[in-house]
């Protein structure tokens, strides 16, 4: 008997037919003699609808109250799925995140898991029940409901798999696995049989929406192999693991874009020690994640510093910097996007960057900023060119 954790996203449970489809997948897994824990997201566009409802009341809702509101979406999903499973003769019980034992820090709307108390889940499994858990949510030390941020249900599933030492952790989506690019927008994409944690982490953080990057971080930390599958088409998916069989096979595993990007530029920064610390220390105090950083050559004792962050955090970043006595000349560009290629094979092969830049040049796409690591190359470009850039780069590297 194996212990299997299965996670289903919002599109997989968006209506009655999809819920019963998921229930049959879960019931078949359980009837095969396995213990099953299911983690479910809110149905369809429920989270966006709840955010819109809050906007009808106030333009500045408190983070605590937003968590109280958003957590209701998953509670609807888990109860309906548990009902469907019981209707199929498969004994099931639904648990909220806090009933399942998720304890978090106090960072409302983007909380991090501090611990998972598994006694309740284990006790229900011992009673031969399928345990249906609300993803994305937990409880902090103040006994307040918290949410884990977008994609938090993936993180919930991996945390359960790690804590229970599950034999498998399956992430069901509306696509059949991890592809070299978004198959809905790019032609001739390839589905990957395997991908490493590091490669998947880069793709997830760069905008590939198959897996949440925090879930991949957690899977890598606890070596939880993930299997990305379609809830609509029962075909083999993609396995995410530490080491893949084709480590020296495909040079590039994927091309991704991220349109949630803002470029903030600070002009005339004193060219002296400690200024970068002051800038990024202020941003760190507000939990603003910075990605690419570009510093100009100093002149007349001054320099310019540009960096990228999520567009949703740009307003706070601008306010924090302008409120400082040191930085008054600050501007923001929200018309940018980031396109990236990822692959462990780049570590030992030359010429990959030139092909990427050639593809952009051939399509008259200007590069504003460049960032590289051992397995990633990213370029900041105009947002209007993002889709064209991904297709051009994919054609250059995979055709």
Predicted regions and their residues:
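Nucleotide/pyrophosphate-binding catalytic subdomain
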Residues: 1-216, 308, 381-382
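Short phosphate-binding/catalytic loops that engage adenosine nucleotides
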Residues: 34, 90, 224, 288, ...
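Surface-exposed amphipathic alpha-helical tracts and adjacent flexible/coil segments at the periphery
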Residues: 211, 222, 233-238, 314
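Active-site C-terminal subdomain of aminotransferase-like
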Residues: 224-235, 259
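A conserved regulatory-domain signal marking ACT and ACT-like small-molecule sensing domains
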Residues: 236-399
């Amino acid at each position: 008997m194996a212990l299997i954790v299965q996670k289903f996203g919002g599109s997989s449970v968006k209506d009655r037919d999809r819920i019963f489809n998921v229930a049959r997948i879960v019931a078949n897994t359980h009837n095969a003699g396995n213990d099953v824990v299911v983690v479910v997201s809110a149905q369809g566009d429920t989270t966006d609808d709840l955010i819109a409802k809050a906007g009808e009341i106030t333009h500045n809702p408190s983070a605590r109250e937003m968590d109280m509101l958003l957590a209701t979406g998953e509670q609807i999903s888990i109860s309906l799925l548990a009902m469907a499973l019981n209707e199929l003769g498969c004994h099931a019980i639904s648990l909220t995140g806090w009933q399942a034992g998720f304890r978090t820090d106090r960072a409302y709307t983007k909380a991090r898991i501090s611990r998972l108390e598994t006694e309740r889940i284990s006790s229900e499994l011992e009673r031969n029940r399928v345990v249906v858990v609300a993803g994305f949510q937990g409880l902090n030390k103040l006994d307040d409901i918290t949410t884990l941020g977008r994609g938090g249900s993936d993180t919930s599933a991996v945390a359960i798999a790690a804590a229970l030492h599950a034999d498998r952790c399956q992430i069901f989506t509306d696509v059949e696995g991890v592809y070299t690019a978004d198959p809905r927008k790019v032609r001739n994409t390839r589905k990957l049989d395997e991908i490493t944690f590091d490669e998947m982490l880069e793709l997830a953080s760069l905008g590939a929406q198959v897996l949440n990057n925090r879930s991949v971080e957690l899977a890598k930390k606890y070596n939880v192999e993930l299997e990305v599958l379609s809830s609509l088409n029962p075909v083999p998916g993609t396995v995410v693991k530490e080491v893949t069989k084709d480590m020296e096979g495909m040079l590039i595993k994927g091309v991704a874009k991220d349109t949630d990007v803002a470029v903030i530029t600070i002009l005339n920064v004193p060219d002296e020690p400690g200024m970068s610390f002051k800038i990024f220390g202020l941003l760190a105090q507000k939990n603003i994640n910075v990605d690419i950083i570009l510093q100009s050559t100093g002149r007349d004792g001054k320099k310019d510093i540009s960096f990228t962050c999520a567009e949703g955090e740009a307003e706070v970043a601008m306010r924090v910097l302008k409120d400082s006595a040191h930085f008054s000349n600050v501007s923001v560009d929200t018309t940018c996007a980031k396109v990236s290629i990822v692959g462990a094979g780049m570590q030992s092969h030359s010429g990959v960057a030139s092909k990427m830049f050639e593809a952009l040049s051939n399509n008259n796409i200007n590069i504003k900023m460049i960032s590289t690591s051992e397995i990633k190359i990213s370029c900041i470009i105009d947002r209007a060119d993002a889709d064209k850039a991904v297709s051009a780069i994919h054609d250059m590297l995979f055709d």
